[in-house]
Amino acid sequence: MRFLAPLLALLLLGGCAQLNAFKDLAGAITDKIQGSDNAEPPKELQPLEPTVNMSVLWTTQVGKGSLGRILNLMPAVTATTVYAADHKGAVVAVERASGDVQWSKDTGLEIASGPVVAGDKLLFGTSNAELVAISLADGALIWKTALTSEMMSLPRVSHNLVIARTSDGRIAAFDLGHGGIKWSHERTLPPLSIRSQGSPTLHGDLVLDGFGAGKLIALNLQDGHLVWEATAVVPRGRSEVERMVELDADAMVQGDVVYATGFQGGLSAIDLRNGSILWHQKTAYTSHATALSRKSLFITDTNSDIWSMDITNGADQWKQDVLHQRRLTVPTRVKDYLVVGDFEGYLHLLRADNGSLVGRLELSGEDPIVATPLAFEDVLYVLTSDGLLAAV
């Protein structure tokens, strides 16, 4: 899994233990997350004659990037403008067509997630347990709301409500206009849990979110009451590590089906109407988001192998391991292709129907691409860990 050492530093241990016991547990989790081949080096890139060419349209610098931290910084795009931020609070608005900077603002925030466009506002979560809204026009502060703990997930917006998940397991709704709290849902985290960057999924009047013990919940958007709870995977095993099951990836919805995956959680299809399990497969899992097409679901697993699975039953359609252990991003769909970034600053283009590699672009020399590339009108917007924002 990407960023293993920082993830281990973020483990939540209930009741806890002596230091030596913690070290043993951390070592076991290291092996479990990275897999039995954790010492295996990333595959070297082989010569490629591209059949589809990618080129850089423009680049600009966004502060200092993530400063080596595990954050959820991603570009946000509108019809005219691309917005991005760094961890130390630098926010820039860039003209989408030319890459010219329209405005920049030093907010002073320790930004952990965002930005997300919501009407005339940009929304962020911070490492200092804040949900913040600034002006889309010039970056001026509109409101700031205190949370119960840091916010690693992206804010979600629907019906004038901002849904925020914090790392202590709470989900809360806030008024988009002034930041006042509307409701809060608290859940009990399992004794051992990995702090997740996954974000709630909003669909109709439901808030969908996965967490430990293999559970996915649906809350009512307006008042936060529990509509249903599904146990997609029953934790099994003799050790605490073997029993860790986190549905921590963003849930995906198509029709009346929600697809959920996460650490040691396999992939599950769940009936959106009542939470019943339609099917479950154990072949692959990811702690990051997935991509959907009409017939397939695409994931980058913990070994950076890319899978295509049938959305009707979870059957494998293809697997691509040519980029094994290259710390890939979540796949992004662009027409008939998938795009992933890697730890050396390369973008890779694959055919969605068979997984074959058809294009490659070195975006920035050895500067990792960790944020999911964002596609808008056949242009990709990519933010590297050092703060390079590029249109491709």
Segments (PLM) and residue ranges:
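Blade/loop signatures of beta-propeller domains
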Residues: 30-59, 226
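Extracytoplasmic beta-rich repeat domains
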Residues: 20-29, 51-76, 103-118, 141-158, ...
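Short loop/turn segments that connect beta-strands within beta-propeller blades
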Residues: 95-98, 135-138, 175-179, 221-224, ...
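Short coil/turn segments within WD40 beta-propeller repeats
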Residues: 89, 129-130, 169, 214, ...
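C-terminal motif of bacterial Sec signal peptides marking the signal peptidase cleavage site
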Residues: 13-15
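Structural signature of WD-repeat beta-propellers
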Residues: 86, 126-127, 166, 211-212, ...
